[in-house]
């Protein structure tokens, strides 16, 4: 227990939490915090010793700097801590919590009074359970609470109160007879029980901008304390697209109508007035706004604040409507839409099956009501929402490491594309499987285990196509740490250390978003109006331009893709920062901007361009092509040629076997891939109707 001669008593304010003010942090002497820092750093070093891992000098310096920043943080501020994946980010959080948990055994402890409490946000349920146990075991009493709803992990541990569900899809939720007493379904009741609150990212999204509603807790005597420290493991989603279309507006009106019963006269009148004003000040202006939307420059267009106001979205009536909505019910869709309309400076339109407008913005994490917030992210320097955000302080990255053992292979070639849409086209998936097989054949002598990552939709089909290589490929590991018969997929690797034995990573596709998502992010980051001015100038020029292809938007795409690749490659043995094993990463048609971002991030890594695809990939693409549900002429021809036993045949024999007419046969012979096949694999003798084709045997090839 740390002694302190004089401690200023914490103010406790009862009543409405919105009226409470945070007490400034630095209320203990520097010597007390320095002692705490030494204990935390000792814990970090002990963790490395227990795991028999080496801690690089610059790595330990970076962790020490991060500890200092956390302990001396100020409420209302937000800091991003750039620690490379596998560099001790989770270890640092564990060391902090273990040391602070001991202090929270008694709120008379000066450190406990100083911090009041902590909120911790993690990605995986298993991590939350581990931290909860660590805190409570270290303190010898309950000082930490994990607040989470039912999920696969906790149900697999037998946390269902009546034992009927062992997986999330078996949980009855509101239909369960024990719903009202289930600690998982009623987890929000436990938000204010202990000084340390642990939650998952999904729940944190609900409180991100209203953190004051969960920043306090009460002890058994109903003494209230304020949690003044927030630790976030990995970058949360900070973007809000603010989408509005007729479907969303109708859904919001329906919610208002169904929220309260209409058989009470007063409620019915209140409801009718609300829906009338909703239609007048929101729905009708939206219909008018659609008339000024242009598609001259592609499916996306820019709308300025003047356009929105001219259509009828007036500040005064919207503010009046917001007050009435708040008086009617809190947290309605209608209230959120009105709030978005009041705070937007510019928006953009998207024309697809429906006409939508988007009012993007960055969520606000700073402010006097917010605790001192620290975002621990291994890709912070590749995240524009952190680096370009004036309200977030990015700590200096003092990490020094050579990445000379890392090599990126950029596969080029027009036959296969890296997008999910292309994967769905006939023959494309087979071509991808051929390409992966080709890469594995080249790499298997150098690498014992290979990690192939693709889109979730194709993870199982590709796994089945790659059956001959199952002994070298790593399967997908689910949330319960069990292997599944599919490839790992984008979005399914968060928080997993199950792929560390891989020394080669193959990215089967690039995890691109929709173009509107990158445009949304660019405008959300446009606090000073630079990007908006750039778009306006482009729209006023005589040269047509698509908004989603503007340089500023493409830059956001490049950084987003590069960030995903960095996180992915660190799932391999590159995560062992003290290691020397060569690491190879194969990328399929990456944009040059992505490669530049990777070069800046990894410094002295290596890049190799592969200019062309193997012949098997090109042929697989061609043989799988369909037109109106039927094989193309080239597909029919190539399929027959690949299955040909090589015996001498005449053109007439081929036409009869494939069902091609004489003109069709002549046409398909001019196809580049068919020509290439004949040049490489076929020997021609005779001429005219005496022409004979023979398949060249392997020796002759």
Predicted features along the sequence, with ranges:
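ASCE RecA-like P-loop NTPase motor cores
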Residues: 2-701
């Amino acid at each position: 227990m740390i002694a302190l001669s004089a401690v200023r008593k914490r103010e406790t304010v009862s009543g409405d939490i919105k009226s409470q003010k945070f007490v400034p942090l630095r209320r203990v002497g520097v010597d007390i915090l320095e002692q705490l820092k030494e204990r935390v750093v000792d814990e970090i070093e002990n963790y490395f010793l227990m795991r028999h891992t080496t801690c690089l000098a610059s790595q330990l310096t970076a962790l020490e700097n991060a500890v200092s920043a956390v302990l001396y943080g100020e409420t209302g501020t937000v800091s991003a801590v750039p620690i490379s994946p596998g560099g001790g980010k989770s270890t640092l959080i564990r060391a902090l919590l273990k040391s602070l948990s001991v202090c929270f055994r008694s709120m008379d402890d000066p450190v406990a009074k100083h911090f009041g409490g902590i909120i911790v946000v993690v990605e995986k349920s298993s991590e939350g359970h581990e931290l909860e146990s660590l805190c409570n075991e270290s303190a010898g009493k309950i000082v930490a609470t994990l607040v989470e709803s039912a999920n696969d992990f906790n149900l697999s541990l037998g946390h269902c109160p009546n034992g009927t569900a062992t997986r999330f899809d078996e949980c009855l939720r509101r239909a369960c007879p024990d719903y009202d007493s289930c600690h998982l379904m009623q987890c929000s009741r436990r938000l204010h029980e202990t000084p340390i609150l642990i939650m998952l990212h999904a729940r944190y999204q609900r409180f991100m901008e209203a953190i004051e509603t969960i920043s306090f807790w009460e002890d058994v005597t109903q003494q209230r304390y304020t949690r003044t420290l927030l630790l976030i493991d990995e970058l949360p989603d900070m973007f809000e697209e603010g989408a509005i279309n007729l479907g969303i507006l109708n859904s919001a009106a329906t919610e208002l109508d169904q929220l309260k019963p209409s058989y009470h006269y007063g409620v019915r009148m209140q409801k009718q007035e609300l829906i009338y004003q909703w239609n007048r000040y929101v729905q009708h202006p939206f219909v008018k706004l659609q008339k000024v939307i242009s598609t001259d420059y592609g499916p996306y267009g820019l709308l300025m604040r003047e356009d929105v106001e001219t259509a009828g979205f007036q500040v005064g009536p919207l503010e009046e409507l917001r007050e009435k909505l708040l008086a009617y019910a809190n947290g309605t869709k209608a209230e959120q839409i009105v709030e978005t309309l009041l705070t937007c400076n510019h928006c953009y339109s998207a024309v697809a099956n429906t006409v939508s407008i988007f009012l993007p913005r960055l969520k606000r994490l700073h402010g006097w009501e917010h605790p001192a917030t620290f975002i621990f992210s291994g890709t912070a320097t590749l995240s524009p929402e952190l680096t370009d955000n004036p309200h977030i302080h990015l700590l200096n990255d003092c990490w020094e490491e050579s990445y000379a053992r890392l090599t990126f292979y950029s596969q080029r070639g027009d036959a296969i594309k890296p997008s999910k849409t292309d994967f769905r086209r006939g023959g494309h998936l087979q071509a991808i499987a051929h390409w992966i097989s080709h890469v594995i054949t080249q790499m298997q002598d150098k690498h014992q285990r290979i990690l192939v990552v693709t889109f979730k939709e194709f993870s199982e089909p590709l796994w089945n196509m790659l059956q001959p290589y199952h002994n070298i490929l790593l399967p997908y590991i689910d949330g319960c740490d069990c292997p599944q018969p599919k490839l790992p997929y984008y979005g399914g690797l968060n928080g997993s250390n199950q792929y560390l034995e891989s020394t080669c990573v193959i990215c089967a596709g690039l995890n691109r978003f929709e173009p509107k998502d990158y445009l949304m992010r660019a405008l959300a980051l446009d606090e000073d109006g630079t990007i908006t001015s750039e778009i306006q100038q482009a729209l006023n020029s005589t040269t047509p331009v698509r908004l989603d292809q503007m340089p500023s938007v493409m830059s956001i795409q490049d950084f987003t893709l590069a960030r995903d690749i960095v996180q992915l490659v660190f799932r391999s043995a590159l995560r062992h920062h003290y290691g020397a094993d060569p690491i190879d990463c194969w990328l399929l048609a990456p944009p040059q901007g992505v490669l530049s971002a990777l070069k800046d991030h990894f410094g002295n890594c290596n890049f190799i361009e592969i200019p062309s695809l193997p012949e098997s990939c090109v042929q697989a693409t061609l043989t799988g092509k369909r037109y109106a549900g039927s094989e193309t002429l080239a597909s029919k021809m190539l399929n027959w040629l690949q299955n040909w036993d090589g015996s001498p045949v005449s053109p007439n024999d081929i036409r009869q076997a494939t069902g091609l007419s004489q003109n069709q046969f002549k046409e398909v012979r001019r196809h580049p891939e068919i020509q290439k096949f004949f040049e490489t694999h076929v020997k021609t003798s005779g001429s005219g109707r005496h022409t004979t084709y023979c398949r060249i045997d392997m020796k002759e090839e």
